[in-house]
């Protein structure tokens, strides 16, 4: 059981805290694991990372002197794509400020914490003209479904 939870923790930690520009060394990873209640050594880290790689997680290993450094590789969206989506959401007038903030929060969760800071550094939805209707997504969905129903009906 400890191995499974350590693997899940390791995958989540690498996803949230590493990217192409921010790696973590084996020793740093051991310290993080131990600080979170997991027993770890070089072999367990190596084995766990290999298991994640075998499970199709894109964990990249780089040589950092005599030690290894690890970081999460490809993600669902690349940083420029996330920037474009965040800009589109924040500048959209029909999305309320509250809904914009919630959507931007969801989009930033797809990036590392460093990339998330970059995404939110210039986003200010409060000063923009936004819709007051928080139910716009529900209304849009209902209209879309109605249009689709009309297309299916003879």
Language model segments and positions:
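Bulky hydrophobic/aromatic content
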Residues: 78-154
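Short, basic/aromatic recognition patches that contact phosphate-bearing ligands
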Residues: 1-88
């Amino acid at each position: 059981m400890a191995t499974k939870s350590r693997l899940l923790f390791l995958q989540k930690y690498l996803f949230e805290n590493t990217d192409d520009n921010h790696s973590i060394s084996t020793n740093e990873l051991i310290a993080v694991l131990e600080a979170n209640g997991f027993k770890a050594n070089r072999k367990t880290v190596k084995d766990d990372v290999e298991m994640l790689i075998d499970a199709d997680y894109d964990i990249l290993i780089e040589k950092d002197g005599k030690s290894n450094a690890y970081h999460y590789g490809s993600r669902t969206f690349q940083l420029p794509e996330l920037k474009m989506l965040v800009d589109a959401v924040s500048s959209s007038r029909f999305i309320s400020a509250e809904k914009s903030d919630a959507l931007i929060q969801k989009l930033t969760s797809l990036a590392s914490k460093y990339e998330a800071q970059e995404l939110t550094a210039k986003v200010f939805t409060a000063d923009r003209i936004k819709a007051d209707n928080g139910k716009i997504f529900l209304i849009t969905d209902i209209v879309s479904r109605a249009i689709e129903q009309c297309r299916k009906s003879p």
